[in-house]
Amino acid sequence: DNADLFPDPASRFQPKGPHGPSQIINPQVFRWTDHDWRGVTIPGQIIYELHIGTFTAEGTYESAISKLPHLKRTGITVVELMPLAEFSGCFGWGYDGVDLFAPSHLYGTPDDLRAFVDAAHKTGLGVILDVVYNHLGPDGNYLKQYSADYFTEKATEWGEAINFDGPNSLPVREFFLSNVEYWIREFHMDGLRLDATQSIFDSSDEHILAAIARTAHNAADGRATIVTAENEPQHARLARPVDQGGYGLDALWNDDFHHSALVALTGHKEAYYQDHSGAPQEFISAAKYGFLFQGQRYDWQKKPRGTPTRGVTPSAFVNFVENHDQVANGGRGARLHQRTSSGRYRAMTALLLLAPGTPLLFQGQEFQSSAPFLYFAEHKAELARAVAKGRREFLAQFPSLATPEMVACFPDPASEETFMRCKLDWSELDKNQQALQMIKDLLSLRREDPAFAAQASGKIDGAVLGPNAFLLRYFLEDEQDRLLIVNLGTDLELARAPEPLLAPPENKTWRLLWSTENPVYGGCGTPNPDTDNGWRFPGESALVLAPGDLQPQAPNPQGTAS
């Protein structure tokens, strides 16, 4: 009955939501079995982003455990959980969390989450958690009731920014850094993904991002941990070692790869896609250098974007063609395979999974799920109307989505139906075995073939072969090079090939090693592209070529002149 009662700001559990009482949790009760788990480092990882509430029909930590063996068999190595901090309403993406230490009660208890992580480690999978340290949600945020010092007058597009460098900011920094330690120590997380770091403001001698990375790396008592981040301005400094003037994060999301891929596959160049053409050179440059914009003018923002990436390891760029934001930003939540041809989608998937960066798949992508991923967030009526209005205004940057006809089709974010539509239909796993088999084979090739496993940008080069076709050559010291040919256009014939990257190693010829046109994947078959009359690359396909021995020439039946 006392209106001045508030939840504990460091509550470990809110069983009745962010407005209810805080439950005392003993973190020592759970019996871990992952004592031999040594953690993860970024090289060699395959990340899988999932939302607990829509990953299974039940939408719980416990039910998600049953899918871990499938992820392992597919070739996934790290599960990335969308934010779990307690938020208001019965469903939401999680980016409006308010109780940073309390895993959402909607998905189970804190020990249920521990059981999920423990099971993942037993299966051979790492787990990292998406955390939001740039703002807190609009409903259920009681931190100001304890101190106004948590926030600053600086604004983000989602609300007040966190005070990491202003008056009385030291306890604020300690609060958030203790949250970093909490997830890694008490839940055995293998690292964190930091949301929208461009909206984390700090002028301290040690930037809070560097402090977060340092804390995360030191918190695991000998286990290896990783810290990845979203950084829209593409500041490569975040992923440089501290002794080189960087912040010491392990990897950054690479929006450039996604934007070029979407333009190439759909032809749409609206809003923040307008600076990308989807041309072959963009993919060659992405494979060699990571970010495409490294200080050039970015017309969409009317200013330079990005910083040079020289010296940043290739595994520090997280590449994707789908994630939660980009699928939802299509307006109707359609998956990318639904917006292009099957051949082109297979070819782009091959590039994603064989390029030197760290690939990320979004839930259901491995079996071409038909479930959309829409923006959903349940709030009280007035706030729900404001959220829906804000979503419409955000999508209005895309002219095709700003028409009255399209606006009328937008799902209501606060509707339970919108949320339920996003749940994966796991019966599609059996129906779409061709798509799944291709992902499995690609990840096996990436893992077992030395050329792809190396993730070495210094040992890769590329060439444009046509308006929609290009090659990447992966160099190995023993001349066991690999050629990845990607053709997003029609059949391409090259009678002459004055391109040295097409030349096989000495005394070798090229043999077809792998193709997206394998009938096992739904393709139409692939003749050897290197013919007596030149090269012939099938349209809408990707091929991997490996050196093979030359066939001995048949003896000349006419003999030789004496």
What are the language-model segments listed below?
Residues 83, 104, 130-131, 166, ...:
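Active-site proximal loops enriched in glycine and acidic residues that flank catalytic Cys/His/Asp
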Residues 51-56, 85, 104, 133, ...:
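Short, flexible loop/turn elements at secondary-structure junctions
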Residues 51, 98-99, 192-198, 330-335, ...:
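Glycine- and acidic
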Residues 121, 163, 176, 181, ...:
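Hydrophobic alpha-helix feature that most strongly marks membrane-spanning transmembrane helices
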Residues 1-48, 57, 65-74, 334, ...:
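Carbohydrate-interacting/catalytic domains
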